[in-house]
Amino acid sequence: MLIIPAVDMKNKKCVQLIQGNPDKKHVELDNPPEIAKKWVEQGAEMLHLVNLDGAINGKRVNDEFIEETIKNSGVPVQIGGGIRSVSDALYFIEKGAEKVILGTVAIQNPKIVREISSIVGKEKVTVALDAKDGKVLIKGWTEKTDYSPVQIGKILENMGAGSILFTNVDSEGLLEGINVLPTKELVDNLNIPIIASGGVTTVEDLLKFKEIGVYAVVVGSALYKDMINLKDAILASK
């Protein structure tokens, strides 16, 4: 199981938000490219890069800054935030991203997943599913749909998604531990890799995800607040 450090960028700083709220931050640090490099030096085999400005504004911004982070990291990078079109996705793949992460746009228009995966290959297309109380959320967690993660996950899998990044919003950013059951439902019902995210605070949390068969876990706040040592986490997850 891969451990993927999160490098969330806002206003050219590295931040960790509480429950996705731009006004509530656990962490705010300068120089995201250097932070990305630090995680790689500690053993990260992949990085999770999120352009929060792009996610909030609904369009690509800070392209050059993101390119620098991708280019200098030395490991595969999955990038999300503000990717709303086929051309946005292709842009980041051409700039060296290993995977692009689609959010609301893929849930509202699943055909875009098929279009992108037919060009770059499904292994390069990840769709982010965020859920609260068993229902998928869209538009930055501001709207709740009537559908479960498994229902939407199956549609996205059929459309050519190569993996699902699943965030249990009930746990995200609170540093209170995890509930693996919603993630396990996806692992049990889909045939593509599931990347788990949200609420990890201990190596024991990571082992719970490993037990249910997730492909990777994105870890953010717990790394930045020194609740988890990255080297220990990687060792435990092998």
Swiss-Prot record:
SUPFAM superfamilies: Ribulose-phoshate binding barrel. Keywords: Amino-acid biosynthesis, Cytoplasm, Histidine biosynthesis, Isomerase. Its EC number is 5.3.1.16. One of its GO terms (molecular function) is 1-(5-phosphoribosyl)-5-[(5-phosphoribosylamino)methylideneamino]imidazole-4-carboxamide isomerase activity. Its main location: cytoplasm. HAMAP family: HisA (MF_01014). This is 1-(5-phosphoribosyl)-5-[(5-phosphoribosylamino)methylideneamino] imidazole-4-carboxamide isomerase. It comes from Methanococcus vannielii. The lineage of its organism: Archaea, Methanobacteriati, Methanobacteriota, Methanomada group, Methanococci. The gene is hisA.
